[in-house]
């Protein structure tokens, strides 16, 4: 990443005067976030927030965090390799990743690789289940993952340093500093992860060959309040990584893959009584280089640069009613070794409403329409209600129409791209039951999703081409449980999730590949004074790896778990020393056919927090 590459998007944003959205939460101190729609228009759906204590318990990758704490299933081509999710039985391209309110799914592949995001760079990670295309656009069918940075406007100066070392020469470094006053707030974090990743296979000869990787990331946020009504905030995230792709057989040619992602966003927010006006400009760049033989310097590449402008106007006449209009424009410019150089323009308009009628009942509604010359986009809608029948029981209902647009690879691949593709579209409905009694929360949500015009690459005349062919029906149930209790110096918490998922091709009646019928997680933590310990449990059910559901090739169900202990040696400042035992049961398992995961291994770390 050169200095020119870093400065250019900032200049582009300043020149475009399309700045954007923000809001405030008043608590003991003022905390500012960008993705305010997540809070204002998600009351009728399930939103699971994973705070910094949960983030720090897990490995730094987004895959590890979500795999052990949510119902989302992940298929991972070996530790640290390509990782893709299945949320409510949908494909990886039907799960949206939202960075501070901006959809960052790849324009080339249509999905996000969850091993290219370091969770410790963010203050909060939230999981929003169900449709969200009315708010967040393409891919938000199964659900969306939200990565948020926060700004505190209070006099403070803090520093955090974490160093870890583990099996297979796995090393990690994370440093974050934050400074703020009542007018200015800024934070910067730097993360480095690397591993030889040469673990031995369990129960058989051989080891993970050519699996080494490293990645670096920088996350920066800075905000300034010009007055009580106007503020400006800059968000920036840079990621650079290299992974050697693990071999199935030692005789295979060794390959590697380089990722470089740059995301910059400038926001202006004006609070004018009942109106909140927001302008946003963002510049995103994704680029990859694939080396088909690491013995040579030749590579293929792909690159997409995106400019996003958004205007957001929120009208809030009182605490019970909100109406939000959003206008946005996106330009994607792509080029690469195997795609035709193309520029795509997309305009969109959204209308969102949230209304509380009394103390027990509220509803949410939304409409969205996109316009582009590349394909015909459907009118999207969402409608949800929430009613509190009793202090301990709340019922939620939600229905929505969502979609996923074709990617640059789908449309413009030189050897088979199809410019006549239509977006995938889905209709879904869900019912959530939430029970809350003192320190216990338990929720059960049932859902049904119907997807049409699903994209598939199929052989046509000796050439593979994408077409709109499949229809998919998905239904199931999700259960979430949480309990926390503090008695004097003792604190205990228990969290659990369970997902039952049926996702079948309507033509064949077969379950989609890499979608388990069952997944369950649980975590138990206990602390007394300066000592704490935890245990994590993960169960993934059997999955099909062939579209004809031939059970001969199934991946068996597996159970694994992690354990850890930590002690704080500090007083005014925090000096924590911790140890983790990963795959504590030494389970022999894979999540992708023939891509073995490591057995029992360890990690030790030290975390220093000082002011």
Descriptions of predicted regions:
Residues 74, 102-130:
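Short acidic/polar hinge/loop motifs at secondary-structure boundaries
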Residues 28-57, 84:
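N-terminal periplasmic "start-of-domain" segments of outer-membrane beta-barrel proteins
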Residues 358-359, 448-450, 468-544, 571, ...:
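Gram-negative outer-membrane beta-barrel transporters
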Residues 63-102:
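Extracytoplasmic beta-strand/coil segments of soluble accessory domains associated
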Residues 250-271, 393-394, 398-452, 458-486, ...:
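Outer-membrane beta-barrel signature, preferentially recognizing the C-terminal barrel domain
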Residues 198, 451-452, 494, 541-546, ...:
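C-terminal beta-signal and adjacent terminal beta-strands/loops
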Residues 195-201, 205-217, 225-306:
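Flexible loop and strand-edge segments within Gram-negative outer membrane beta-barrel domains
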Residues 62-65, 83-86, 98, 112-118, ...:
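N-terminal periplasmic accessory domains that precede
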């Amino acid at each position: 990443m050169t200095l020119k590459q870093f400065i250019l998007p900032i200049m582009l944003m300043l020149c475009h005067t399309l700045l954007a959205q923000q809001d405030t939460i008043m608590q003991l101190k003022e905390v500012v976030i960008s993705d305010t729609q997540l809070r204002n228009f998600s009351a009728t759906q399930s939103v699971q927030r994973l705070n910094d204590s949960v983030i720090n318990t897990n490995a730094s990758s987004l895959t590890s965090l979500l795999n052990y704490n949510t119902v989302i299933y992940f298929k991972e081509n070996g530790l640290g390799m390509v990782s893709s999710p299945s949320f409510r039985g949908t494909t990886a391209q039907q799960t949206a990743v939202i960075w501070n309110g901006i959809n960052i799914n790849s324009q080339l592949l249509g999905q996000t690789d969850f091993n290219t995001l370091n969770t410790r760079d963010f203050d909060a990670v939230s999981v929003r289940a169900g449709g969200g295309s009315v708010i967040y656009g393409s891919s938000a069918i199964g659900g969306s993952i939200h990565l948020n940075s926060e700004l505190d406007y209070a006099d403070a100066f803090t520093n955090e340093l974490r160093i870890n070392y583990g099996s297979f020469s796995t090393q990690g470094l994370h440093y974050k500093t934050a400074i703020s006053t009542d007018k200015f707030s800024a934070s910067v974090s730097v993360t480095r992860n690397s591993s030889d990743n040469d673990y031995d296979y369990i129960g058989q000869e051989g080891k993970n060959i050519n699996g080494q990787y490293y990645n670096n990331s920088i996350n920066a946020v800075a905000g300034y309040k010009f007055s009580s009504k106007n503020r400006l905030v800059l968000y920036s995230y840079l990621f650079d990584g290299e992974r050697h792709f693990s071999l199935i057989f030692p005789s295979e040619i060794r390959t590697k893959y380089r990722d470089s992602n740059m995301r910059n966003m400038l926001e202006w927010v004006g609070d004018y009584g009942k109106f909140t006006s927001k302008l946003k400009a963002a510049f995103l760049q994704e680029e990859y280089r694939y080396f088909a033989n690491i013995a040579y310097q030749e590579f293929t590449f792909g690159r997409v640069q995106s400019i996003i402008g958004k205007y957001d106007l929120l009208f809030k006449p009182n605490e019970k009613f909100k109406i939000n209009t959003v206008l946005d424009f996106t330009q994607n410019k792509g080029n690469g070794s195997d795609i035709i150089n193309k520029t795509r323009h997309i305009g969109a308009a959204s209308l969102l409403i949230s209304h509380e009628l009394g103390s027990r009942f509220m509803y949410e509604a939304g409409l969205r329409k996109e316009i582009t010359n590349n394909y015909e986009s459907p009118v999207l809608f969402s409608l949800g209600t929430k009613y509190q029948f009793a202090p301990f029981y709340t019922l939620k209902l939600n229905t929505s129409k969502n979609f996923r647009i074709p990617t640059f690879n789908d449309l413009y691949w030189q050897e088979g791209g199809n410019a006549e593709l239509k977006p995938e579209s889905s209709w879904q409905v869900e019912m959530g039951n939430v029970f809350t009694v003192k320190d216990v929360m338990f929720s059960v949500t049932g859902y049904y999703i119907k997807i049409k015009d699903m994209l598939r690459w199929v052989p046509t005349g000796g050439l593979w081409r994408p077409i709109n062919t499949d229809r998919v029906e998905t239904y199931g149930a999700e259960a979430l449980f949480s309990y926390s209790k503090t008695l004097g110096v003792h604190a205990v918490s228990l969290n659990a999730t369970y997902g039952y998922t049926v996702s079948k091709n309507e033509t064949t009646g077969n379950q989609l590949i890499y979608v388990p019928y069952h997944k369950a997680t649980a975590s138990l933590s206990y602390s007394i004074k300066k000592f704490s310990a935890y245990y994590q449990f993960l169960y993934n059910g059997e999955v099909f790896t062939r579209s004809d559901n031939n059970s001969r090739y199934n991946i068996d169900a597996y159970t694994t778990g992690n354990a850890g202990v930590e002690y704080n040696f500090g007083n005014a400042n925090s000096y924590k020393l911790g140890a983790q035992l990963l795959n504590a049961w030494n389970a022999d398992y894979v999540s992708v056919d023939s891509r073995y995961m490591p057995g029992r291994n360890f990690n030790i770390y030290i975390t220093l927090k000082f002011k």
